[in-house]
Structure formats: structure tokens, C-alpha cells
């Protein structure tokens, strides 16, 4: 758990069989800048001051707590075994 100089809270990482996850709590001022109807690209969330290693994907916003951003990235071994018929694996805004 880390709180940077920007007062963001970074959760510990956790995982399932396919992904590594973490969530980031941003300040109320930054939360106002988050798009309401779509997920952000890595360039967008980095421009808000979120700092993480490459490969993290913003995959969900929890509607009641818009200041909590959820990120995931495939586990190295899971990339070989992920099933699906193409398309995007983005979950979206809830």
C-alpha cells in the first residue's frame, strides 16, 4: 500500500488465474476529471498523475465510488492460456 506525494492510495496487488489486479483511490479533485461514460487509456490515467509500471489496463469504474479506479494486467503465464474469440476484454463502467 502506497500513498504518493499526490495523495493517491495504491492497493496491494492481488490476482486470480488470469489477471493481476490493483485499485487506486484518487483525490476528489482528480475524480472530477475522470470520464463518466468510458474507460481511460494509459496515457489518460498517467496524465492524471497515476504512476504504475507498464501494462496495467483501466478496466472498470465502480459507479458509487468514482474515485476508485480498478486496473488489471494479464499474468505472464495466463497470456498463453486465455480463451476467447477475440474482441476486447474490457469490463467497463458500472
Curated annotation (Swiss-Prot):
It is found in: Nucleus. PROSITE patterns: CKS_1, CKS_2. Its main location: nucleus. One of its GO terms (cellular component) is nucleus. The keyword Nucleus applies. SMART domains: CKS (SM01084). It comes from the Eukaryota. It holds the Pfam family CKS. Keywords: Cell cycle, Cell division, Mitosis, Nucleus. Belongs to the CKS family. This is Cyclin-dependent kinases regulatory subunit.
Amino acid at each position: 500500500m502506497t500513498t504518493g506525494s499526490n495523495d493517491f492510495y495504491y492497493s496491494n496487488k492481488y490476482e486470480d488465474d488470469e489477471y493481476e489486479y490493483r485499485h487506486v483511490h484518487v483525490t476528489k479533485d482528480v475524480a472530477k476529471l475522470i470520464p463518466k461514460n468510458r474507460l481511460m487509456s494509459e496515457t489518460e490515467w498517467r496524465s492524471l498523475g497515476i504512476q504504475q509500471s507498464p501494462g496495467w489496463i483501466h478496466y472498470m469504474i465502480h459507479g458509487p465510488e468514482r474515485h476508485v479506479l480498478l486496473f488489471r494486467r494479464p499474468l505472464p503465464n495466463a497470456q498463453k492460456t486465455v480463451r476467447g474469440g477475440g474482441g476486447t476484454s474490457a469490463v467497463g463502467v458500472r
